[in-house]
């Protein structure tokens, strides 16, 4: 288990595990993370690292957080999550982050990390209590859906079928409440 603050240190300023907690090994932290074009990278910086690197006004700074994580020692980046998994598996002093689907496919070799006392589970993802679970959205506008009925049809198909398929690709389903809200918004948008 680590706190959000410790996780920010692990992925930025700490060089050795013992820099984070004195009772952890005095071994270099080996970091394996997605590339900067990844939404997973962006979300991790925003949710975990940026709060540790505020701007001059004291606000969370994504820019400062990104600079801190990119300046970390022993950092390996890859757009291929399988490469990240193999890097973490390759050393007891390695840590990484990537989509839950890649953890599930390698659960026999990897250990998940509780953050702020919350384990990554379907329940903690759904109720947003796990600090680094993130929702995925699709976006359009009412105008586009009115001008292009095929877009409206696709969005409706997606919203009414997403939970039937999403588990197969390693994502957690959206709650009934979230889906109903999206369907209500879809209805309002196409009826404008």
Name each region found by the language model.
Residues 1-192:
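Flexible loop/hinge segments at secondary-structure junctions
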């Amino acid at each position: 288990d680590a706190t959000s603050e410790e996780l920010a240190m692990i992925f930025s300023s700490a060089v050795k595990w013992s820099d984070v907690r004195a009772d952890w090994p005095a071994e270099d932290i080996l970091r394996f993370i997605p590339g900067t074009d990844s939404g997973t990278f962006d979300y991790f910086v925003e949710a975990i690292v940026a709060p540790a690197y505020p701007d001059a006004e004291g606000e969370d700074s994504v820019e400062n957080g990104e600079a801190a994580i990119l300046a970390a020692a022993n950092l390996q980046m890859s757009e291929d999550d399988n490469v990240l998994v193999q890097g973490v598996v390759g050393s007891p002093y390695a840590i990484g982050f990537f989509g839950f689907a890649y953890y599930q496919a390698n659960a026999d070799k990897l250990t998940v990390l509780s953050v702020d006392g919350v384990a990554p589970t379907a329940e903690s993802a759904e109720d947003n209590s796990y600090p680094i679970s993130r929702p995925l959205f699709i976006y359009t506008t009412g105008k586009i859906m009115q001008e292009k009925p095929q877009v409206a049809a696709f969005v409706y198909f997606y919203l009414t079928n997403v939970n039937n398929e999403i588990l197969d690709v390693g994502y957690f389903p959206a709650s009934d409440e979230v889906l109903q809200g999206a369907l209500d918004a879809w209805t309002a948008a196409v009826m404008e």
